[in-house]
Each structure stands twice: as structure tokens, then as C-alpha cells.
Amino acid sequence: MRYLAIDLGAKRTGLAAGDDVVRLVQPVEVIDVPRGPALAEALARAVERHGPDALVIGLPLNMDGSEGAAAAEVRAFGATIAARTGLAVHFHDERLSSFEADQRMARTGRTHREKKQLRDALAACAILEAYLAETG
């Protein structure tokens, strides 16, 4: 099954693609659109471009593992995307995914601007890699 992972942000949303056969995950793009109807449309177009079978959306849990207001907002947005695309949406813990993305970029020699742009897509990679590892 092919997945498109989504790391939702207030200003930018990172996307990563991968599958559960070879378990290769790669960053594919960053969408520079604030969350809302315009982002839902941009994600629907990204789904058409990348052709996933399902979506994995990072769920912002509290550090104790509980769900707060941010998680409820992401779940509601996920329901919108599911209705718009007709794809199954899976949610996965995104705690520390941005930290992991920063660690991956720490020694790459990229400029601050390049790192800032790539960070969200690498966070989506971390979310999808963890999801695939957990689901078998």
C-alpha cells in the first residue's frame, strides 16, 4: 500500500511518500499554504499528483500522550481531507518529529532557508517511518 504522510503546520505542511512493501520513505514536497480551505484544496491536488492509497496525518499529542485541542483540530481537518479525497486517513503520533527532522539536517551543510523549507517534509518522513514500523 502506498501512503502519503502529512505533517500539518500553521503556515507550511510537509509531505512524504512511502509504502509498506519496501518501506522506503522520502520527502516529496512542502505546501506553503496556511491551514484552512485553501490547504484542503492544495492537499487534494497533492493526492492526485502522488497517487497514494491512504493518508497518514501526524497527530499532535501532549507529551503525556493525551489529546488536546490541537489534536481535535487535526482530526477534524483529517475528516475533511478524507471526505475530499475518498482515502482512508490514519493518524499517528507526531511528537518529536520536528526534532528528528532537525537532527537529520544538522550536518547537511544546507543553508538556514533550505533547512527551514525541508524541515516539514522530513518531519512527515519521521511520522510515516514510525507509522510503518508500528503497523508491521
Language model features with spans:
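Phosphate- and other anionic-substrate recognition elements at nucleic-acid/protein interfaces
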Residues: 2-6, 10-136
